[in-house]
Amino acid sequence: MGSKVAGKKKTQNDNKLDNENGSQQRENINTKTLLKGNLKISNYKYLEVIQLEHAVTKLVESYNKIIELSPNLVAYNEAVNNQDRVPVQILPSLSRYQLKLAAELKTLHDLKKDAILTEITDYENEFDTEQKQPILQEISKADMEKLEKLEQVKREKREKIDVNVYENLNEKEDEEEDEGEDSYDPTKAGDIVKATKWPPKLPEIQDLAIRARVFIHKSTIKDKVYLSGSEMINAHNERLEFLGDSILNSVMTLIIYNKFPDYSEGQLSTLRMNLVSNEQIKQWSIMYNFHEKLKTNFDLKDENSNFQNGKLKLYADVFEAYIGGLMEDDPRNNLPKIRKWLRKLAKPVIEEATRNQVALEKTDKLDMNAKRQLYSLIGYASLRLHYVTVKKPTAVDPNSIVECRVGDGTVLGTGVGRNIKIAGIRAAENALRDKKMLDFYAKQRAAIPRSESVLKDPSQKNKKRKFSDTS
């Protein structure tokens, strides 16, 4: 207990360590190497990081392995302070305690000091991603200064970064940040929409660890048996996908609910299905190149794989995970951005669906009295004006087709609608537009005796009403 209290006092005494060395740490950019045009921290490599996390979990029997693989604390801080230049596969590991503990043990080894192993069992509880000071007590401010001098010698031997290239990269990043959230990336959209500015600019996830987790599939984590259950669950994108799926459905529901106040529940469900189907979400995912960033332990391009046979659902999943990542990153500020972004993506899908799908057609301009009007103009008993259902709606084709006919089989008008009632009304409306036909049958009705022209309107089966010849 006394050791722990002393440790906390030591930490308080070293609170100024980061402030005093902040400028020096920011100068550590010269320890990076220029790899394929991108700046990357050279002290950590992905495979070694995986081994390091395992070694820390099994520290007692793996201490020697940690000393062999781990960079020291200065190198670790360089990676933490420059996460935007760290390979994305490594970012989740920087949010866990194991790498920092390994770096501190390596620091003690470099400084020829004995490790305080009694502190190791409590290390995970003390670990905080926001805390930059060493947790192990034996690493003092003087030790860090000495280590800085050793690192300076190493830095002088490394290849220096082309300053002009680095500045150009910074300028490019600044230009991108200056673009407003309403701006667009003028990339091609394929068959989704033909527009000059498409797709809408992607809202950015600021937290690099969350952004990296969006593109990590569960298959890359399942063999990491050294991770605890909680660490494993939070190392891949399934939880983010779960959150993003709910957000996507809710936002799309609100968009169409407010946009179409006259739509029935069935119509709203049909339209929402167009917006949140795996096929549509997959198209959006590919449009933003999410499929190229997805990390799995199987070949996504294998044409015979179960993945391909599953219609590329993983691509839709990563899009939902990105939405979830935005919410986890900054729910208060990002939710309005998500709504605005999804509204832009939804617009061409909604326009196409409402234009081409009969089930989504509006009926506010439908003349509900069209059948009565048609009978009043040309109807009489022997004409036998009636409506025949030519096609009923099915799951494959929701269209209904109804024909307005007379007794001899002549078709006066044809109507199409999402149900038989609407299709019948449209058939009557179609017949009413044919003025030549109406004139022909009106003259026929006028030529017959009045007693034969009295008829019962078949469309009013429950009403005892007669239409007399008024011509």
Curated annotation (Swiss-Prot):
Record carries keyword Glycoprotein: no
Chemical reaction(s) catalysed: Endonucleolytic cleavage to 5'-phosphomonoester
Biased composition (Polar residues): 20-29
A GO cellular-component term linked to this record: nucleus
Coiled coil: none
SUPFAM superfamilies, sorted: dsRNA-binding domain-like (SSF54768), RNase III domain-like (SSF69065)
Enzyme Commission identifier(s): 3.1.26.3
Top-level EC class as recorded in UniProt: hydrolase
Annotated RNase III domain residues: 227-331
Domain of life, per lineage: Eukaryota
Compositionally biased residues, Acidic residues: 172-184
Protein keywords: Endonuclease, Hydrolase, Nuclease, RNA-binding
Domain DRBM per the UniProt entry, residue ranges: 369-437
UniProt cross-references to PROSITE patterns, sorted A to Z: DS_RBD, RNASE_3_1, RNASE_3_2
PANTHER family, A to Z: RIBONUCLEASE 3, RIBONUCLEASE III
Function: DsRNA-specific nuclease that cleaves eukaryotic pre-ribosomal RNA at the U3 snoRNP-dependent A0 site in the 5'-external transcribed spacer (ETS) and in the 3'-ETS. In vitro, cleaves synthetic 5'-ETS RNA A0 site in the absence of snoRNA or other factors. Has an essential growth function in addition to pre-rRNA processing.
Note: Present with 4970 molecules/cell in log phase SD medium.
Name of this protein: Ribonuclease 3
Annotated source species: Saccharomyces cerevisiae (strain ATCC 204508 / S288c)
Gene: RNT1
